[in-house]
A protein has these predicted regions:
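Charged, amphipathic alpha-helical coiled-coil/dimerization segments
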Residues: 69-128
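Alpha-helical initiation/capping and key positions within long helical/coiled-coil segments
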Residues: 3-6, 10, 56, 63, ...
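DNA-binding alpha-helical recognition surfaces that contact promoter or target DNA
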Residues: 66
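C-terminal regulatory/oligomerization modules of transcriptional regulators
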Residues: 1, 121-151
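N-terminal positioning helix adjacent to the helix-turn-helix/winged-helix DNA-binding module
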Residues: 7, 33-35, 95
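N-terminal helix-turn-helix DNA-binding core of bacterial DNA-binding proteins
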Residues: 20-63
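N-terminal leader segment of winged-helix/HTH proteins
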Residues: 1-29, 98
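Generic structural signal for well-ordered, non-transmembrane alpha-helical segments
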Residues: 9-16, 94-98, 124, 131, ...
Length: 151
């Protein structure tokens, strides 16, 4: 295995470990992993459409829709009708913000501590590098992905 392949494998495994960490955190918090991501997406205080959340957080639209229905029934999200277009934007209600804080408190603390520990060893530029790498990987995979029906 050449050096690039070794580095790519380490990056792939690192991102999978991070995903796994969130998965196990969600299980411990007794929420679905995609609900945790949805709360994270909405916790920035800005309105978002279901399509935006599906695209930005890489969650299937049907899963976003199902989770939104559950959160709406629990009183945690509300739809806004003031945005242009036919799709309504979502926001957390006051109860939803309290629920998100309760579910995510330990997660945010863990993330901050992990970032602080990382910044003790590495430059903050690692975030830009990781973001750029993610953009490049997605772009290259998109260019090379087989189309449906290709064999």
């Amino acid at each position: 295995m050449n050096e690039y392949d070794k580095m790519l494998r380490r990056l792939y495994l690192a991102t999978n470990r991070i995903d796994g960490g969130y998965y196990f955190f969600a299980r411990g918090a007794e929420v679905k992993e995609n609900v945790l991501a949805l709360l994270y997406a909405l916790d920035d205080g800005q309105p978002h459409t279901q399509a935006e959340i599906a695209r930005d957080w890489q969650i299937p639209k049907t899963t976003v829709n199902t989770n939104i229905k559950e959160l709406k029934a629990a009183g945690y999200v509300a739809f806004l009708s003031s945005r242009a277009g036919r799709e309504k934007a979502l926001v957390l209600t006051e109860a939803g913000r309290a629920y998100a804080r309760r579910v995510q408190r330990g997660m945010y603390e863990a993330e901050r501590t992990a970032l602080e520990r990382t910044l003790e060893r590495f430059s903050p530029e690692f975030v830009d590098a990781m973001d750029y790498f993610a953009d490049c990987v997605c772009e290259e995979l998109s260019r090379r992905a087989p189309q449906k029906g290709d064999k």
